[in-house]
Amino acid sequence: MIDNHFTEIADLESLDRFVANLNGSAGVVFKHSDTCGISARAYTEMSKLELPIGIVVVQHARSVSDEVEKRWQVNHETPQVLIIKDGKSVWNASHFQVKADEVAAAAAKVDSEQ
């Protein structure tokens, strides 16, 4: 079950819609595995944030996960967080580097660089 804090990205249309709805602000694409303990910890971290967060559960949306890798030229990892601004990936982290305070700081920095 996905927390109400997240927007589920289950197909390419919902990925495009999520990115478009950011309207120039920074947002997060969070690739999550529902069978991984490290990903469960990252899920808890991401739940602390007050940012737009789109979640891709890789077991249910493999085509979306593949598109994230292709579109933003990042190697596939889970858990993985990408900060998206103006349709571009401007920051990313994976595994134990997925920490709420670091994601929030990176997003704030990106948003201040207008």
Task: Identify the meaning behind each predicted range.
Residues 15-49:
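Local sequence-structure signature of Cys/Sec-based thiol-disulfide redox active-site neighborhoods
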Residues 31, 51-67:
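Thiol-based oxidoreductase modules, predominantly thioredoxin-like and allied folds used
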Residues 41-54, 70, 85, 91, ...:
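Non-catalytic interaction surface on structured domains
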Residues 38-45, 60-64, 68, 79, ...:
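Amphipathic alpha-helical interface surfaces
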Residues 72-85:
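Structural micro-motif
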Residues 85-114:
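Non-catalytic, surface beta->alpha helical segment in thiol-disulfide oxidoreductase systems
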